[in-house]
Amino acid sequence: MIKITKEANIARNVLLLKGLENPILKEYNDIKEKERELLIAEYLYKIMSLLNLDLKNESLKDTPIRISKMYVNEIFSGLDYKNFPKIMLMDNKIKFHEMIIVRDILLISTCEHHFITINGQATIAYIPENKIIGLSKINRIAQFFAKRPQIQERLTKQILLVLQVLLQTKNVAIIIHMDHFCVKARGVCDTSSSTVTSCLDGLFKSDKNIREEFFFKK
């Protein structure tokens, strides 16, 4: 059985403490994965039938279970902290206290208002104090929180806060550019607009030169 790691528990607890956790129920945590997939597929079957789709059709008959598996194992896998990435934190023995920036992190999420895709990129930076982290883990943490029904504002703050607590520093900054298909494909149908959110703390917030380096350094 996969257990929730210490780092995953730290992440979850700090988000709960700060009121930044997603609105996740606890009642269904004991449902096994396969049972959850089947239950979701049953409801999807009903939804598709109410849309007058013929579920006997060769192309559609397996769609409910395909969507269900996609929800549980892929696009909403970030709802389960057992899927939180394994984190490699190291003592900053080399005394590196300059800015570390990871650019163009691919994020694919889902709008929690319409259950339609949000996709874009994040740039994340930190200035180490006592701890440093494997670079790919920054990407994986960001992608973990993206794999939930989300709003971009919450996602931005979640990533920042979790990195702060794991890295034991306030010096973290993040900016996210995303395209919302709830804007592109419905409602206003604006295919050219995008949404930008940012969150800065520590030296990124208090020091103008560091802030400008984060936003403008290539």
Swiss-Prot record:
Biological pathway: Cofactor biosynthesis; 7,8-dihydroneopterin triphosphate biosynthesis; 7,8-dihydroneopterin triphosphate from GTP: step 1/1
Catalysed reactions listed for this entry: GTP + H2O = 7,8-dihydroneopterin 3'-triphosphate + formate + H(+)
Coiled coil: none
Any one GO BP annotation for this protein: tetrahydrofolate biosynthetic process
A Pfam family annotated for this UniProt entry: GTP_cyclohydroI
EC number of this enzyme: 3.5.4.16
Binding site for Zn(2+): 111, 114, 182
Gene Ontology MF, one: GTP cyclohydrolase I activity
Source organism, top-level taxon: Bacteria
Listed InterPro entries: GTP-CH-I_C/QueF, GTP-CH-I_N, GTP_CycHdrlase_I, GTP_CycHdrlase_I_CS, GTP_CycHdrlase_I_dom
UniProt-listed Gene3D superfamilies: 1.10.286.10, 3.30.1130.10
A single cellular component GO annotation: cytoplasm
KW Hydrolase (keyword) present: yes
Keyword Metal-binding attributed: yes
Keywords: GTP-binding, Hydrolase, Metal-binding, Nucleotide-binding, One-carbon metabolism, Zinc
Quaternary structure note: Toroid-shaped homodecamer, composed of two pentamers of five dimers.
Classification via PANTHER family: GTP CYCLOHYDROLASE 1 (PTHR11109:SF7), GTP CYCLOHYDROLASE I (PTHR11109)
Family: Belongs to the GTP cyclohydrolase I family.
Protein name: GTP cyclohydrolase 1
Organism: Buchnera aphidicola subsp. Schizaphis graminum (strain Sg)
Gene: folE
